[in-house]
Amino acid sequence: MAFPSMLDLKARFAQGDSTRLDIITPNGRVLSSGDPDFQTQIRETLGVPVKLMEFPQVAETRLRSGRALHLVTTASLISMENLYPEGDFDPRRFRPNIVVNSPPGRNGFAEESWVGETIRIGPEATLRVEKTNRRCKVTTMKQDDLPYDGKILETISQKNGNVLGVMCSVVKGGIIAVGDELEPSPAEIDDLPHHSAPPRHLSQGSVGNRI
């Protein structure tokens, strides 16, 4: 990661104004994007030349990869914890857009079996699971209360071919929220060998955001 100090920052929408962003520094200082000096303040905080850019809610510009969303299941995180009990496989290490809460007792890397399939989240959002996600050393870095741990990536590499989670493209946009069910797209249900499995639910993710 070019700027590891960014992991120490937190972001939130300004209270009562979703058009402004607050950046919270490790010492608790709040930098507001509405402040005329914001760009200078964020550069001084990070010690590198950076610029905050605003995109409309529905962006006209597509991400070049076409695989804009990262999804991981709690089953995968629990499976990794079982392989390396001393490690903390907190979702923050892996920076997913969406965390799917797997049914109780379910383990293994469930989302890897969804590659090539179409899934629906909530009433309208539809994603295509494009590929598994190869991990890098950012997963080992210290951030907030998570310590540096090189064995996180070592375990993923040795036990699961250096992949954790999947990358998805958006087939149909929609609003998603914590608690939404994730299930096979209706057009594919009859063709999926595991369509009888109980639906999964979002436990974390792009809460109330359009994808």
What positions do the PLM features span?
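Metal-cofactor-dependent catalytic cores
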Residues: 1-211
